[in-house]
């Protein structure tokens, strides 16, 4: 239903979500595959040129609502977005970031546990996103995507044991 309301013409495996949170990067050049209509880019804000393959989004849309519609998420190293993307089974195209305390740990975690591709800020700006290339596989395998449910179940058991 959401695919219809957004008028998405490409299948999920050719739909990309761009999430940069508060970084507000002035992106003007999408990947060639987006420009040629092979991929659809869902993005927040209006920094990209308006084309049929670029869907600018406004609130109330949230990134986690859109991830099930996509195969890949283009993002900076940010804990919440990476967790949501991996939790939804999305591959991550991660823009390398210097000067951010958690960046190295998040980049390493994505490489260990998610299908991924690291790109430089320059590659981001010139549209060199490697969308036609398969993502690199995780070095150690994916994380358990039911971790939140497992933790909630365990917490409920502990609390119930305390009541009895």
Task: Show where each model-derived region lies.
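A donor-sugar binding/catalytic signature common to diverse glycosyltransferases
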Residues: 62-105
